[in-house]
Amino acid sequence: MKWHLKCSTLVVKLFIASVLICLAATPSGAETTPLQELIGRANDQVAKFVEQFSDVKCTEHVTQEKFKADGKVELKEESTYDYLVILTNAGGEISLDESRLAVHEQRKDEKKGVSMLVSNGFATLFLVFHPYYSSGFEFTDLGEDTINGRKFSKVQFKHIAGMRSPAALALRGREYPLDLAGVAWIDAATGIIGKIDAGLATSMEDIGLKSMRSEVQFQPVPFKNSKDTYWFPAQASVEVETPRQHWRNTHNFTDYKQFSVSTEEKVASK
């Protein structure tokens, strides 16, 4: 994940680190709780989803809003992109990178002193439940909830200080691991994630970041030539506040299509 501010002296970037293929094993003979079994199913789903997500492209519509001190919108910009996530695998290390090709970019309102938030990568918040990262979080069962008529298990997550985190804040040449905390709505039977709400477990106002909240909603996407139905991000919203500024970006993802790209390396014979 990344975000940064345009036309501002403060530049903030949020990175999701590379993901390693690492399956956590349960000690032989150890009994597992229902919550551990649910997290295990979510681990399996996310590990598969990382590869599924890189096999599709979609249309992304981004709405950027900057708010005044009284809460009214000061500036609003809208853009549309062809969007895809590029997956690379080198020696067992998986890296996810977003690619955006502009379809429509609103003509920028050149207001002096007005900065806009640019947010990238928040659709991949599901990496909290990837096997490589989930051991760095505490999970709590919050019972059941219903979204659009479908039952989900609500699971609270909180990053354990000192453990690996899928996100880090890069600011003025330094990187700060982020202590993410939030709630995920997970299908109890399949481990499919329907929604994630996340933010900072502790304030980072001392370095210029007062608060950050992000919500990602997932929806089932059927494909013509596939018997399986996959759940992909439908909307990702990001709200960021510094002591003096307030932004909200909303990313809507539509028109998912499958595609495949194969590359072949040939060495010319002498």
Language model feature labels by segment:
Residues 1-12:
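N-terminal secretory signal peptides that target proteins for export/translocation
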Residues 29-181, 188-195, 199-235, 239-270:
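Structured extracytoplasmic
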Residues 11-25:
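Bacterial N-terminal signal peptides
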